[in-house]
UniProtKB/Swiss-Prot annotation:
This is Type 1 encapsulin shell protein EncA. Its main location: other. The gene is encA. Disruption phenotype: Does not form fruiting bodies. Decreased survival when grown under oxidative stress (0.5 mM H2O2). The 32 nm encapsulin nanocompartment is formed by 180 subunits; monomers form pentamers which assemble to form shells. There are 36 pores where the pentamers meet as well as 3-fold axis channels and dimer channels. The N-terminus of the protein is inside the shell. GO terms for cellular component: encapsulin nanocompartment.
Length: 287
């Protein structure tokens, strides 16, 4: 364990520390949505503070030739920046009496506070992935400059959601992004897809899954009635992770024991036109 995660005065026994960290990991896996549609770049190491942030050009097909002399349009970095990887964190407290009671009565240590901190960190990670952070200068999938948009349409009518997502995949296809596609929707829109699609006897969401083979998900971080369709793959976007979600001990305070759940990561958008947001009838086609 790195020294900065567990100080020498850490009060937990080895099995208690393992239980705490396993709880953090389980909650993160259950809660995170953005990672389900993104490739991971890393972990790079907790000391890595910056990462290249490239935007690429070149989506024309590869060449076919006998001797390999035919010229092709090269995939190249159109713009390169270096961005600082932000830290996402949430603190929690374990009371010394709870630790002693668990040991005295030979009971598992209650790590509910760690689970709560991990869930809140997971929510903030998805917030960063979908909306970025304007104060720190980070873009998200819903706010990226150069993304495509389509009108949301009327999802209260059967087939309305399916038609909107068909239109989004069509626009992505026109930009040279042929999938596989993934869809993330706000809970309100997601719930409206659980109805029989016309006279097929099939739920509308199942019809959409045939278009979006990388999954159809809901996220409570998406606001109001909104959604996003992406062409997945690290050639289009990925999540640069320097440190994955883990617990650290902060040192004793008034006999009690504060801990921190933390991670360090950054969404890297390489092809903004591999993203198509569903933003309502007044949305502009491209930003």
């Amino acid at each position: 364990m790195p020294d900065f995660l567990g100080h020498a005065e850490n009060p937990l026994r080895e099995e208690e520390w393992a239980r705490l960290n396993e709880t953090v990991i389980q909650v993160a896996r259950r809660s995170l949505v953005g990672r389900r549609i993104l490739d991971i770049y890393g972990p790079l190491g907790a000391g890595v503070q910056t990462v290249p942030y490239d935007e690429f050009q070149g989506v024309s097909p590869g060449a076919v030739d006998i001797v390999g002399e035919q010229e092709t349009a090269m995939v190249f970095t159109d713009a390169r920046k270096f961005k600082t990887i932000p830290i996402i964190y949430k603190d929690f407290l374990l009371h010394w009496r709870d630790i002693e009671a668990a040991r005295t009565h030979n009971m598992p240590l209650d790590v509910s506070a760690a689970a709560g901190a991990a869930a809140l960190c997971a929510q903030q990670e998805d917030e960063l992935i979908f909306y970025g952070d304007a104060r720190l200068g980070y873009e998200g999938l819903m706010t990226a400059n150069g993304r495509l948009t389509v009108p949301l349409g009327d999802w209260t009518s059967p087939g309305g959601g399916f038609q909107a997502i068909v239109e989004a995949t069509r626009k992505l296809n026109e930009q040279g992004h042929f999938g596989p596609y993934a869809v993330v929707l706000s809970p309100r829109l997601y719930s409206q897809l659980h109805r029989i699609y016309e006279k097929t006897g099939v739920l509308e969401i199942e019809t959409i899954r045939q278009l979006a083979s990388d999954g159809v998900y809901q996220s409570n971080r998406l606001r109001g009635e909104s959604g996003v369709v992406v062409s997945t793959g690290r050639e289009n976007m990925d999540l640069a992770v320097s440190m994955d979600m883990v617990a650290a001990y902060l040192g004793a305070s008034r006999m009690n024991h504060p801990f921190r759940v933390l991670e360090a990561l950054l969404l890297r958008i390489k092809h903004p036109d591999a993203i198509c947001t569903l933003e309502g009838a007044g949305a502009t086609e491209r930003r």
